[in-house]
Regions:
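Gly/Pro-enriched, hydrophobic low-complexity segments
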Residues: 150-213
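Bacterial Sec-dependent N-terminal signal peptides
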Residues: 1-26
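Extracellular or lumenal secretory-pathway regions
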Residues: 21-132, 137-140, 147, 161, ...
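Structural motif
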Residues: 143-144, 155
């Protein structure tokens, strides 16, 4: 049974691994954040860590899961070689991605935030870019080699404490946090469910494309699959909740069929506990 489920997950990875790409900007800078988080309020310590990239251009930023990007790249090369789904799973299992891996695009020229994710199908929503209402104070700390100042805000349902540095005069940060006089170096919520920490920052030696993925990979290769479906933010959040509540049931919903084991029984419920960043 375990082998069957591994195959199903691996095949799902193959189906949605490659998507159409559109250039939205060129990244001049890159910040890497360590994203530690709990998956249940009762946990005394963080349960998981994701490594996140923030690519920064002149008119847009993109915040994304580095391991998810690596898995896509490896899958791409494997598909070109007609490698079997189970073998692809073996090659990508060292890059664990917990749950879905949303990509956050801040389109400053359009004053729009675009959030996209994929299960077996792709979805996205857009919302106006609203800058957090920051309260600045004079508390100063040296964090990760930078002199930082403190700021707080109540934003998208949670109270955040952040430290930013004017040594990097870019008004960006992890997730949807932005609008300070310098790069956000550390951010945590009042409940201590989430912690973003700057691991390193660099100016890229040459500009790299910031790519927005919006089309599913075709059955025979190439970016010829269905366009990501635009949904309301409310629907997007509900899909995220349903996916984490029972992965298999959500895949049944998307595929219009019931995933079954070799015995013919429906695949057992598979829950991925999580706490949403917004509430």
């Amino acid at each position: 049974m375990k082998r069957v489920l591994i195959f199903l997950f691996a095949w799902t990875l193959v189906v949605f691994a490659l998507q159409a790409q559109t250039e939205i900007d060129k990244a001049m800078f890159r910040a890497m954040y360590k994203f530690s988080y709990k998956t249940s309020p009762e946990q005394p310590t963080f349960d998981w860590v994701d490594w996140m990239y923030l690519d920064i251009g002149n008119k847009a930023t993109m915040f994304y899961n580095r391991y998810a990007e690596l898995k896509d790249s490896i899958t791409n090369e494997c598909l070109k070689q007609n490698i079997a789904p189970e073998a692809i799973h073996e090659r990508t299992k060292n890059y664990p991605v917990r749950g879905d891996a949303p990509v956050y695009c801040q389109l400053y020229s359009e004053k729009t935030t675009r959030v996209a994710t994929r299960y077996t199908k792709g979805y996205y929503y857009e919302e106006p870019m609203v800058m957090p209402q920051w309260i600045l104070d004079n508390k100063s700390l040296t964090l990760y080699g930078y002199t930082c100042l403190r700021a707080t805000t109540h934003y998208l349902g949670r109270t955040w404490e952040v430290y930013y540095t004017t040594e990097i005069p870019l008004s960006y940060g992890p997730w949807k946090l932005w609008g300070l006089p310098g790069l956000i170096v550390r951010a945590t919520d009042a409940d201590h469910y989430f912690l973003f920490e700057l691991d390193h920052f660099k100016r890229l030696s040459k500009p790299e494309l910031i790519i927005y993925i919006h089309r599913e990979f075709g059955n025979k290769g190439g970016y010829t699959g269905s366009e990501y479906k635009k949904v309301s933010k409310k629907t997007f959040v509900e899909y995220e909740r349903l996916f984490h509540k029972d992965v298999m049931a959500f895949l049944d919903f998307e595929m219009g069929d019931i995933i079954r084991s070799t015995s013919g029984d429906p695949a057992p419920a598979t829950e991925i506990p999580y706490i949403p960043l917004e509430k």
